[in-house]
């Protein structure tokens, strides 16, 4: 056992002894259930922070606060609540039992304090401790007592401690909540109806991904955690709800990375009588307005860059983007869609770029891999990439002028994809054929290919109006708004391998 662990265990034992003493003296004081708080710290700072010492003395304002003890310096405590921090002062009026209980306080304890509001000589607000109650005894010391909470893995595993001691983490999740609320309000103002669709599917669909499999005991059948809500949302459009959206979790049984977590949050929406061009316009309007509302500016720092949500956003086809970011590659510069349709040409090109190939990859998959390796990381400013091949877009409508590609886009910023949208395929026969092609791809070894969904085909046969739909990755969007570079920093409890 290390000296560090021994010291920590000693402190835990001391704190347990203090709690046992409280239980012995008065069991009701060990974990009291009631404390009436009149103000949060930030409210007091906002209302009285500009008053002079003399004005506060004359006012004689009584307040009641509650929060966690973050520092104890002689008679002064620093108390933190959800809004911020304020001091409490245990001066000469603190005598007898109150003084003894104050001396037993530890950093991390949760307390309530009542008393008059004052201003210190340094200009800091504080509450004179005229009445005090221990609300919860913290049995474990906060990490900065020893080494601080700087280890990233510990921050993710013990998010509750991370939130206590790291203001940056608290602010990131406050911003996340604001981003989600702003998106929801924007969609409602645009007359979209918020809906909820199943989280467990009999047939996984709506995206190309490997699903999580579970078992329904009562029905004795396999079910799948949803990889996307798309097919259910489009059923609602068939049913007559012309504008719908859902903000919820998706689950994909894939690897962990700075951009991927097995469960993640998406906002997915569908609008009848619109196409993918309308979606791009709506996305520009949404993101620029949210940035201005939440940050006061359409521009925000992201790493070494400044990204500008103000618009208009760049729009390039996938082929154009590959050519733009490979200016020295003569083969790419001369490449045409006819060559893109040649699988051997595409395999040779991908190999020449150092891309490890899978046997089952189609021409579209090869084009997407080349794009992902050579162009995607360079898309720092908001950019719509269009012209996605039909063989990697099984739910998107074919382009009228080039049936090799679809009316689909993905939205990139900060070098990563944030959104995916397209004009929906509403031709039931074409959808049937594409589902069958996906089944063949799965049989050939592509475990992310889609399943055949006969009920969805039936829904399309009832008539889906011209419709466009889009999914926006909330986690990746929040990464931009908080200037963070790993998805784990914006998910409260990210997936972690169990500790040994």
From Swiss-Prot:
<dbReference type="InterPro" id="IPR012340">
    <property type="entry name" value="NA-bd_OB-fold"/>
</dbReference>
<dbReference type="InterPro" id="IPR018149">
    <property type="entry name" value="Lys-tRNA-synth_II_C"/>
</dbReference>
<dbReference type="InterPro" id="IPR044136">
    <property type="entry name" value="Lys-tRNA-ligase_II_N"/>
</dbReference>
<comment type="subunit">
    <text>Homodimer.</text>
</comment>
<dbReference type="GO" id="GO:0000287">
    <property type="term" value="F:magnesium ion binding"/>
</dbReference>
<dbReference type="GO" id="GO:0005524">
    <property type="term" value="F:ATP binding"/>
</dbReference>
<comment type="similarity">
    <text>Belongs to the class-II aminoacyl-tRNA synthetase family.</text>
</comment>
<dbReference type="InterPro" id="IPR045864">
    <property type="entry name" value="aa-tRNA-synth_II/BPL/LPL"/>
</dbReference>
<keyword id="KW-0436">Ligase</keyword>
<dbReference type="GO" id="GO:0006430">
    <property type="term" value="P:lysyl-tRNA aminoacylation"/>
</dbReference>
<feature type="binding site">
    <location>
        <position position="410"/>
    </location>
    <ligand>
        <name>Mg(2+) 1</name>
    </ligand>
</feature>
<dbReference type="InterPro" id="IPR006195">
    <property type="entry name" value="aa-tRNA-synth_II"/>
</dbReference>
<dbReference type="Pfam" id="PF01336">
    <property type="entry name" value="tRNA_anti-codon"/>
</dbReference>
<dbReference type="Pfam" id="PF00152">
    <property type="entry name" value="tRNA-synt_2"/>
</dbReference>
<keyword id="KW-0963">Cytoplasm</keyword>
<feature type="binding site">
    <location>
        <position position="417"/>
    </location>
    <ligand>
        <name>Mg(2+) 1</name>
    </ligand>
</feature>
<dbReference type="InterPro" id="IPR004365">
    <property type="entry name" value="NA-bd_OB_tRNA"/>
</dbReference>
<keyword id="KW-0067">ATP-binding</keyword>
<keyword id="KW-0479">Metal-binding</keyword>
<keyword id="KW-0547">Nucleotide-binding</keyword>
<feature type="binding site">
    <location>
        <position position="417"/>
    </location>
    <ligand>
        <name>Mg(2+) 2</name>
    </ligand>
</feature>
<dbReference type="GO" id="GO:0005829">
    <property type="term" value="C:cytosol"/>
</dbReference>
<protein>
    <recommendedName>
        <fullName>Lysine--tRNA ligase</fullName>
        <ecNumber>6.1.1.6</ecNumber>
    </recommendedName>
</protein>
<dbReference type="GO" id="GO:0000049">
    <property type="term" value="F:tRNA binding"/>
</dbReference>
<keyword id="KW-0648">Protein biosynthesis</keyword>
<keyword id="KW-0460">Magnesium</keyword>
<dbReference type="InterPro" id="IPR004364">
    <property type="entry name" value="Aa-tRNA-synt_II"/>
</dbReference>
<dbReference type="InterPro" id="IPR002313">
    <property type="entry name" value="Lys-tRNA-ligase_II"/>
</dbReference>
<dbReference type="GO" id="GO:0004824">
    <property type="term" value="F:lysine-tRNA ligase activity"/>
</dbReference>
<keyword id="KW-0030">Aminoacyl-tRNA synthetase</keyword>
